[in-house]
């Protein structure tokens, strides 16, 4: 049955996916999905049940890949699709429900450490790269052969960085090649323990060198990309890269380059705006945006502690993948904070936008921790794990008696003076023998009461004695989808 408020039950079965599936010719499956390496991974572990996780755009090949792997390995394959939050994260919960002994992740990945010790391997794909065109573009944007530059790429172009570096190394000596921070096979020792791991990549820095000294040349961005559809992986790099250092992107198909400095400036300016909105907020909604990334529970407890120390009220919301329609059900929230992987937190927002700003945990940290950033260090972080104890960027909250809590602060949005946290403005009981008791004109300031008083409609009015008495009449019968007095359609 169909009505104004509901769709027929058959609509869910007839609905087509919004992303067209990819269908690879059978003779190219082994090359595109690296089935030889995946087969070795499964056979070395002796797995009998393996889950294959595909993003929406690769689900068209999922059946053929699973059938090929079952035929070669003899193991039972389970296909995972339509993940609850983001396909870039490993769906360890889905793998555990299937009783899998290993997981193979296909497509773009954030490479965040999973919350489970399940053996995992990644197949990032191999996008074609015009090496000669990219090498000429690099030389055009970097005329100084002594300037330090690091080669970056989107995950699908990582295979081309080594060949590209071979074309450039005779001329450029201070060239650093990044590689994806893939998990090592179980039981294998680390071959490069000195590598710096950041942004889901490993940087083999020489002793005494720092990543902040390098410019960047990114292979993977398209010339037609705009700010509204900026790839979240590129956004993560632009936010975290050292301000003032050159950052160029190169289209792997055409070799056209683009200076990303202006986009990086706009991203940082928006981050400063969101930090101001978080400082003005009194009620914060913490969105659980991942359950499969390591330390997500510890991060959630850290964010609740942050908001409490700043005198804000927080609520934890588990709504799955956030959409404007879902978040519109919580008008009491001033801002939302999405606890997700770096790519999920920086994913492009829907065209309509959210009615309240959606922040990352790093922006909430900057808004609520008066000791942030640490002296001499102003990193633009993108992953919540970098805020937790054990990270070099972790900054503990100052003690209650610290003067940092009393620093005057003026909102750059409203122009009003922000009050200190409520616990800071309470009476000092250390020497209160001769302090007169206040008049208590305002007993308590509640964010919930302030929000209720600002609403146009505050509920049904009693209007006692003003409503005429009437005899009770029979109401409507049935359920909301089809009352008895409504004709069936």
Curated annotation (Swiss-Prot):
Gene Ontology MF term list: 2-(3-amino-3-carboxypropyl)histidine synthase activity; 4 iron, 4 sulfur cluster binding; metal ion binding
Alphabetical list of InterPro entries matching this protein: DHP2, DPH1/DPH2, DPH1/DPH2_1, DPH1/DPH2_3
Residues carrying Phosphoserine: 7, 446, 488
GO biological process, one term: protein histidyl modification to diphthamide
Cofactor: [4Fe-4S] cluster
Phosphothreonine: modified positions: 467
Protein name stated in the entry: 2-(3-amino-3-carboxypropyl)histidine synthase subunit 2
Encoding gene, per UniProt annotation: Dph2
